[in-house]
């Protein structure tokens, strides 16, 4: 799942999505 979020945040084409998933991704990676 982390890869999925990273892939969507890499192009930063969707800042809204990236920002919305950023916290979830951060928690997933840190947890």
From Swiss-Prot:
Domain named BPTI/Kunitz inhibitor: residues: 1-31
Bilayer-crossing regions: none
Site (Reactive bond): 19-20
Superkingdom per UniProt: Eukaryota
A GO molecular-function annotation: serine-type endopeptidase inhibitor activity
Key words of the record: Disulfide bond, Protease inhibitor, Serine protease inhibitor
Protein's job: Serine protease inhibitor. Inhibits trypsin, elastase, plasmin and kallikrein.
Name by which UniProt lists this protein: Kunitz-type serine protease inhibitor RsTIQ2
């Amino acid at each position: 799942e982390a890869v999925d979020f990273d892939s969507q945040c890499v192009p930063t084409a969707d800042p809204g999505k990236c920002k919305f998933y950023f916290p979830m991704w951060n928690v997933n990676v840190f947890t």
